[in-house]
C-alpha cells in the first residue's frame, strides 16, 4: 500500500519537476523491487507529451545492455545512453496527437550487479497536438505577401530558431540567388506549385567565377542558385534551375543546389542543371530527398554525407551521363543510397545511351542503387561504373535494377576494379569494390537506418502528407473535418491558393464546387487535396444491390437479406454510433451528430457523406 501511494506521488511529481530531480529521488528511495520494475518517463498513460521528448527507463540497480530489445510502436529502438540505473532513448521527432507504446522485453537490460536479465514491461503515452499557426511569411511577386523575393524572406528569417520557420512562396519565376546563414536553422521553404514556383539564376562556379562580386554580387562567394548553409533546411514544392547549365545544356560547373549542413530535407522539388546540379556537403551531413526530380549530365549529384534518395526521378541530359561523383571519407557508413528511383531521359522519347551510375571523385566513396527502374529511353553501360577519377570506392553497388518492361538488368559485367594515378597500367593505388548487394543488404538500407544518427532524425515524418479533409457546405458556409496533426489548412479555389486558416470553416463566395482544402503539417508540408464539397441534405448511394437513402434525419436501406450494420463517424473521426437495421425499415437518427454513415450488408457496403 505504501509503495502504491509513493508511486502516485512520483507520477504527480514527474509532471511538475525536472527529470533529473525525480530520477535522483527514485534511485535514492529504492521504491521499486530491485532490478525488476522500470519507472517510465513519460509516465504510463501520460497525455500531452512533447513530440521532442526523450524516453527514460530506470531501475534501482545499475543497468547494462541485455540480449533482447525495446520497441516503440513496433519499431526497434536502442538506448542512446545507459548510465547507472538510467537508460535514455532519443526517438527523434514524434508524431503529434499520436499514442505510442513502449515495449521493453524481458532481458533487454541486465543487472549490473550480477548480470541477471531484468523483467521488462510496456506502457503508453500520447503526444500533444500541434500549436495552431499559419505560415510565418508569404512571398508573392505581385506584392500581396510579406515579401516580393525569396531572398528577402530568407534573409529576414530569425536566427537560432528551434521550431520550423515557414515561408510560403506563391507561384512565379524568381530570378535570384538565395542563401541561408549558418545561424538560421529550421527554415522551411514551401512553394505553391512545383511546376509554377520557380527559383532560377545563371551562374557558374568555374574558375572561381562565383567569387567575382562584379559578376555575381549576391553570390556571397558560393556558386549554387540555392544554398542551405543552415541545419534542418526543408525544400518543398519548388523548382530550382541553374540556367547556365540548363539553358546551354553544357558545362562547366553550374550548381542548382548546395546543401552544406546537417538534416537537409527535400520533398516534391525539382533540381535542373547540367554539370554538378547538387552538391551534398560534408561527411557529417545527412540529406533526404523524397519524390523529387533531379536532372543533369555530368557528376550531377556529388560530394559527401549519408544521403537517401527515396522514390526520386533521375533525369539524364545526354549520352554518357554520369549520375554521381561521391567523395566520402573513410568514416562514412552508408554514403549515397538510392531507393525505388526511376531513371529517365530529360527529353522523353530521346534515347540516352552508354550511361554510368557514377565515378569515384575522392576518398572512399559509397553508393547503392536499390530497386531502380530504367525507362525505355535509358541504356546503361554494362560496366555501370567508371573505374577511375580520384578515389577508391568501398561500395559502388546495386540491387534489383529493372528495365522498362520489368525485366532484371544483368549485373554480371559490373565493374569492381578501381585505380588512381595517371597510368592504368601503373596505378598509384587500386581496390576491389562491392558491385552487387544481396537482398538482405538492400533491405537493411532503410531511411531510418541510414539517417537516424544519434539524434533519432526522422525526415520521413517531415514529408508526411496529411490526409484530405472531408469538405461540405451548408448555405454560404464551407466546413471540413479536422486533422489532429495539422497546424493550419490551405484553401484553394479553382486550383489556386486562396488563403491559410487555422479554423475548420469559412464563408465562401462564388461557385462552391471550385473550393478545395488541404491540411498543413508543422513543417509546412502540403497535404492531400480534398474532393469537391458536398451539400448537407438528401444523400443516395448504391453498391451492387444495396441502396441507401438519408434524408437528413432518417436512413433507409434496401436490397439485402437479414440485417445491415450502420456505423456513424463524427467530424474528428471517432465513432458516433452503431446500429443494426432491417430492409426497408427507417432508422431515425434523432440528434446524433456525424459526417459519415457506413452501411454494411451482405450485398455490399455504402458510405454516405451525410452531415449532421
Predicted regions located by residue number:
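Acidic, low-complexity Ser/Thr/Gly/Pro-rich repeat segments typical of extracellular/periplasmic
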Residues: 33-131, 482
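Surface-exposed, short loops/turns at beta-strand junctions within beta-sandwich domains
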Residues: 92-99, 507-515, 588-594
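Edge beta-strands of extracellular beta-sandwich domains
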Residues: 122-123, 524-535, 604-612
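Extracellular recognition modules
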Residues: 101-105, 516-520, 596-600
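Short beta-strand elements bearing conserved aromatic residues within extracellular beta-rich modules
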Residues: 68-70, 489-491, 566
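Sequence-level preference for short, compositionally simple segments enriched
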Residues: 128-477, 481-484, 488-490, 498-533
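C-terminal outer-membrane/trafficking sorting elements
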Residues: 539-612
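Short beta-strand segments within Ig-like beta-sandwich modules, predominantly Fibronectin type-III
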Residues: 79-83, 496-503, 577-581
Amino acid at each position: 500500500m505504501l509503495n502504491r501511494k509513493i508511486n502516485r506521488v512520483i507520477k504527480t511529481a514527474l509532471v511538475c519537476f525536472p527529470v533529473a530531480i525525480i530520477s535522483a529521488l527514485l534511485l535514492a528511495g529504492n521504491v521499486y523491487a530491485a532490478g525488476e520494475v522500470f519507472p517510465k518517463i513519460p509516465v504510463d498513460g501520460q497525455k500531452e507529451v512533447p513530440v521532442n521528448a526523450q524516453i527514460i527507463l530506470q531501475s534501482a540497480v545499475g543497468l547494462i545492455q541485455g540480449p533482447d530489445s525495446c520497441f516503440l510502436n513496433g519499431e526497434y529502438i536502442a538506448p542512446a545512453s545507459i548510465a547507472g540505473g538510467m537508460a535514455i532513448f532519443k526517438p527523434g521527432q514524434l508524431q503529434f496527437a499520436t499514442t505510442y507504446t513502449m515495449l521493453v522485453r524481458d532481458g533487454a537490460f541486465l543487472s549490473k550487479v550480477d548480470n541477471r536479465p531484468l523483467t521488462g514491461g510496456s506502457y503508453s503515452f500520447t503526444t500533444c497536438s500541434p500549436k495552431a499557426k499559419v505560415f510565418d511569411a508569404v512571398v508573392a511577386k505581385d506584392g500581396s505577401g510579406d515579401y516580393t523575393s525569396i531572398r528577402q524572406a530568407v534573409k529576414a528569417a530569425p536566427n537560432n530558431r528551434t521550431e520550423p520557420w515557414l515561408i510560403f512562396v506563391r507561384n512565379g519565376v524568381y530570378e535570384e540567388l538565395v542563401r541561408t546563414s549558418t545561424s538560421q536553422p529550421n527554415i522551411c521553404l514551401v512553394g505553391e506549385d512545383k511546376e509554377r514556383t520557380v527559383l532560377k539564376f545563371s551562374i557558374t562556379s568555374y574558375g572561381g567565377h562565383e567569387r567575382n562580386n562584379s559578376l555575381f554580387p549576391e553570390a556571397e562567394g558560393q556558386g549554387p542558385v540555392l544554398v542551405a548553409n543552415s541545419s534542418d533546411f526543408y525544400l518543398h514544392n519548388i523548382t530550382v534551375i541553374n540556367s547556365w547549365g540548363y539553358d546551354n545544356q553544357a558545362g562547366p560547373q553550374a550548381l542548382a543546389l548546395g546543401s552544406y549542413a546537417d538534416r537537409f530535407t527535400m520533398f516534391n522539388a525539382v533540381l535542373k542543371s547540367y554539370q554538378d546540379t547538387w552538391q551534398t556537403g560534408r561527411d557529417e551531413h545527412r540529406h533526404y530527398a523524397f519524390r523529387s526530380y533531379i536532372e543533369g549530365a555530368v557528376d550531377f549529384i556529388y560530394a559527401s554525407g549519408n544521403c537517401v534518395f527515396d522514390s526520386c526521378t533521375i533525369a539524364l541530359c545526354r549520352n554518357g551521363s554520369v549520375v554521381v561523383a561521391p567523395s566520402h571519407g573513410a568514416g562514412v557508413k552508408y554514403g549515397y543510397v538510392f531507393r525505388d528511383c526511376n531513371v529517365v531521359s530529360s527529353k522523353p522519347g530521346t534515347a540516352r545511351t552508354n550511361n554510368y551510375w557514377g565515378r569515384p571523385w575522392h576518398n572512399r566513396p559509397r553508393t547503392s542503387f536499390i530497386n531502380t527502374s530504367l525507362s525505355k529511353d535509358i541504356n546503361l553501360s554494362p560496366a555501370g561504373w567508371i573505374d577511375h577519377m580520384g578515389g577508391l570506392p568501398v561500395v559502388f553497388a546495386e540491387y534489383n535494377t529493372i528495365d522498362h518492361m520489368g525485366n532484371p538488368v544483368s549485373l554480371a559485367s559490373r565493374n569492381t576494379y578501381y585505380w588512381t594515378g595517371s597510368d592504368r597500367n601503373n596505378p598509384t593505388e587500386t581496390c576491389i569494390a562491392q558491385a552487387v548487394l544481396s537482398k538482405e543488404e538492400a533491405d537493411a538500407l532503410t531511411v531510418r537506418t541510414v539517417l537516424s544518427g544519434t539524434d533519432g532524425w526522422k525526415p520521413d515524418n517531415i514529408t508526411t502528407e496529411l490526409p484530405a479533409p472531408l469538405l461540405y457546405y451548408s448555405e454560404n458556409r464551407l466546413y471540413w473535418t479536422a486533422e489532429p496533426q495539422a497546424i493550419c489548412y490551405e484553401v484553394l479555389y479553382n486550383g489556386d491558393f486562396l488563403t491559410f486558416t487555422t479554423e475548420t470553416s469559412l464563408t465562401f463566395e462564388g461557385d462552391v464546387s471550385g473550393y478545395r482544402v488541404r491540411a498543413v503539417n508543422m513543417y509546412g508540408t502540403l497535404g492531400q487535396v480534398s474532393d469537391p464539397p458536398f451539400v448537407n441534405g438528401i444523400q443516395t448511394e448504391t453498391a451492387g444491390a444495396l441502396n441507401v437513402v438519408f434524408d437528413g434525419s432518417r436512413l433507409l436501406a434496401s436490397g439485402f437479406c437479414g440485417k445491415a450494420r450502420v456505423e456513424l463517424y463524427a467530424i474528428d473521426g471517432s465513432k458516433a454510433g452503431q446500429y443494426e437495421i432491417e430492409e426497408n425499415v427507417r432508422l431515425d437518427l434523432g440528434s446524433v451528430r456525424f459526417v459519415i454513415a457506413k452501411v454494411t450488408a451482405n450485398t455490399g457496403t455504402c458510405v454516405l457523406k451525410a452531415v449532421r
